[in-house]
A protein has these predicted regions:
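Sec/Tat signal peptide C-region and signal peptidase I cleavage site
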Residues: 18-22
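C-terminal membrane-anchoring or membrane-association module
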Residues: 201-213
Length: 213
């Protein structure tokens, strides 16, 4: 299991009173196509329609579409493709009123540098992660079969919680499956998540995220 950490610096949101916490998002990578966090709520898209809370320029597909969408490697079930059938756009997950999460995981397929995920608490942007941030070192962007560009990615938000996620792409396409969310009690979110993974912590790399407000 590999880990990367992004820092979310406190910043005033222009035109509002919202302030992003001085917290961080820790990103880990685990084997398989599903979360290893016990008790997480999982959305697998197998019903063929988007679950409650999802909306925007995304579609649930049951197979690859040449030149437009590719099923994540090894995934023979339905998956979410953003922004099919368009080349660019965003899909948004909005939590139920009063619900906050600090863990999110997904099986991210054929990771591209023009894919991104943004975490929000209301209108406050907590952090942005792009495909470049999560692809395995040395892997080819957009590879539809290689494990380094098709991987289960876990995000643990420390000293922050989210109620909205934006999935975006500026070209064909952002494919994913088995979204998972959980509210892990703080403090010690990261330690609890690592315990759930049951894997050794191998490497940590810290970098500062460029946030746009």
């Amino acid at each position: 299991m590999l880990s990367r950490k992004w820092i979310a610096a406190a910043a005033l949101v222009a035109g509002t009173s919202s302030v992003a916490h001085a917290g961080y998002i820790d990103t880990t990578f685990t084997s398989g196509m599903t979360t290893q966090v016990a008790g997480a709520t999982t959305y697998d898209f197998d019903s063929g329609v988007k679950p409650d809370g999802y909306g925007g320029a995304g579609a649930v597909l049951t197979d690859s579409v040449s030149g437009m969408a590719a099923a994540p490697a090894g995934d023979s079930t339905a998956f979410l493709s953003v922004a099919y059938p368009s080349s660019s756009g965003t899909e948004t997950f909005l939590a139920a009123p009063g619900q906050q999460y600090n863990y999110f995981g997904l099986y991210w397929g054929s990771i591209d540098d023009y894919n991104w995920i943004k975490f929000y608490d209301g209108s406050t942007l907590l952090g942005t992660v792009t495909g470049t941030d999560v692809i395995q070192a040395g892997a080819q962007l957009g590879d539809q079969m290689a494990p380094g560009s098709n991987r289960y990615v876990n995000f643990a938000l420390n000293d922050m919680s989210f109620n909205k996620i934006e999935f975006g792409t500026s070209n064909f396409a952002f494919e994913s499956d088995n979204h998972a969310m959980a509210a892990v009690p703080e403090p010690g979110v990261l330690a609890l998540v690592f315990a759930a993974f049951g894997a050794l912590f191998l490497m940590r790399r810290r970098r500062t995220a460029d946030l746009t407000f």
